[in-house]
Amino acid sequence: MKTLTRNILRTAITVILVILAFVAIFRAWVYYTASPWTRDARFSADIVAIAPDVSGLISQVNVKDNQLVKKDQVLFVIDQPRYQKALAEAEADVAYYQTLAQEKRVEAGRRNKLGIQAMSREEIDQANNVLQTVEHQLAKAVASRDLARLDLERTEIRAPADGWVTNLNVYTGEFITRGSTAVALVKENTFYVMAYLEETKLEGVRPGYRAEITPLGSSKTIKGTVDSIAAGVTNASSSSDSKGMASVDSNLEWVRLAQRVPVRIRLDQQQGNLWPSGTTATVVITGKEDRDTSRANFFQKLAMRLREFG
C-alpha cells in the first residue's frame, strides 16, 4: 500500500512538474514570438546631401572626413576669381545702363514738355519707346548683377546645420559641377531608430508606447518612445500594366510571411554619433510604461537575452 501511494505521489509530482515546465516554456515562447520586438532595427538620422550651386575648380577644402562642424561653417571653396570678374562685369553693365537711362529719361522729358507744337508725335513716341527699352535693359542688368553676386556667395559651400561631415569626396584642384553631391552631413541631435516590426505584432504598438533599444554587440540599453507607425508599405505582388490597370500576381504560397512595417522611435537622450546612422539594434516595445526586469522569471530573462544576442 505504501509502495502504491509512493508511486502515485511520485507520478503526480512528475506530471505537475512537467505541466509547470510546459506552461513556463509556452509562456516564454509566446513572450518571445508574440510580443512586439524585432532585431531588424537601425539607427537613423537626418542627412543632408550637400551639392554646390555653381561649377568650377575647388580651390580650398577646410574640413576633414567625419569632422563635427557648426552651422554656416565653410566646408570648401570653389574658384572665386572667375565669379568675382563676372560680378564686376555685371556691375559695369548696371552702371552703363543707369547712365544711359538717365540720359534717355531727360531726353524723353524734354520732348514731352515741348509737345507736338515743336516736333512731331512720332519723334515724341520714339523718345518714350527708347526710354522704355533702356529701362528694360537696366532691369535685366540689375537682375544679372544680383545673380552674379549670388553665384559668388555660393562659391563658399557652408554647412546648413550642426553635424558630422561624412563621405567627403572633394579635393583641391578637382573640378566639380553644379548639383553633384560632394559630401553628406549627418545632422547633430537628429538620431532616431527605425524598427521594422512584423504586422502580427503591431497590435501591441501605439504612438507614445515606451521602447528599449539594444545596439548590436552592446549590453547598454537605450530608452525611447514610439513616435509614429508607417501608414503603408510597398505591395510586391501588385503593379500596373501599360493601361494603368492593377496587375496582381497569383499568390498561393503555403507559408504566408508577415510584412514588416517601419516604426519610428524617438530617443529619450541623443547619443551623439556613438551609434552611427545605419547600425543595427534590437528593439522591444514595452507598452505604456518602461519594463521592470526585476520581476521577470528565468525564461523571460532568457528570452530577453535571446532577443538581444540571438
UniProtKB/Swiss-Prot annotation:
InterPro entries to which the protein is assigned, alphabetical: CusB-like_dom_1 (IPR043602), CusB_D23 (IPR032317), MFP_Efflux_Pump (IPR050393), PHBA_efflux_pump_AaeA (IPR022871), RND_pump_MFP (IPR006143)
Q: Where are the transmembrane segments?
A: 12-32
Membrane-topology annotation of the record? Single-pass membrane protein
- Enumerate the Pfam families for this protein: CusB_dom_1, HlyD_D23
Q: Which UniProt keywords apply?
A: Cell inner membrane, Cell membrane, Membrane, Transmembrane, Transmembrane helix, Transport
Q: Where in the cell is it found?
A: Cell inner membrane
Protein family membership? Belongs to the membrane fusion protein (MFP) (TC 8.A.1) family.
Q: What does this protein do?
A: Forms an efflux pump with AaeB.
Q: What protein does this entry describe? A: p-hydroxybenzoic acid efflux pump subunit AaeA
Q: What gene is behind this protein?
A: aaeA
